[in-house]
Amino acid sequence: RREKATSNICTNQGLCALRAIIYLSALGNGIRELALINHRLAARCKKELAARGCAPLFDRPYFNEFAVRIKKAPTVMKRLESEGYVPGVHLGDYYKEYKDCVMVCCTEMTGPAEIDAFADAVARCAK
């Protein structure tokens, strides 16, 4: 019965693990390059957001995600969502002291042009 279940959490975890294994196997030695790409894209996004007035929350090492302070973050996030963006995780939902902070993530699926457009949209929606 468990083997045929499609809504069982264990089945879902197994399918997610299988998908990850297939993806990583296809990458092979390219996983290091993928990690470097992700980090470079996140660094670009962090820099572009900072240039538009969104300060990084922490000055610490990061990989492909970072926290940024955006004035009126909940309002800005709603505006971004209405424009079709997935702006990140609102940290204020978890920590009251970070009510104007968002966790942003960049992966190999995010290109430089999309990062620039996102940073422009954040600046526009924050006005």
Where is each model-derived feature located?
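Active-site C-terminal subdomain of aminotransferase-like
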Residues: 1-52, 56-59
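Short, glycine-/Ser/Thr-/acidic-enriched flexible segments
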Residues: 4, 15-16, 22-29, 63-64, ...
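Generic non-transmembrane alpha-helical segments
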Residues: 44-52, 75-85, 121-125
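Conserved PLP-binding catalytic core of the aspartate aminotransferase-like
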Residues: 54-83
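A short linear hydrophobic-aromatic micro-motif
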Residues: 53-56, 86-92
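PLP-dependent enzyme catalytic core of the Aspartate aminotransferase-like
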Residues: 79-82, 93-127
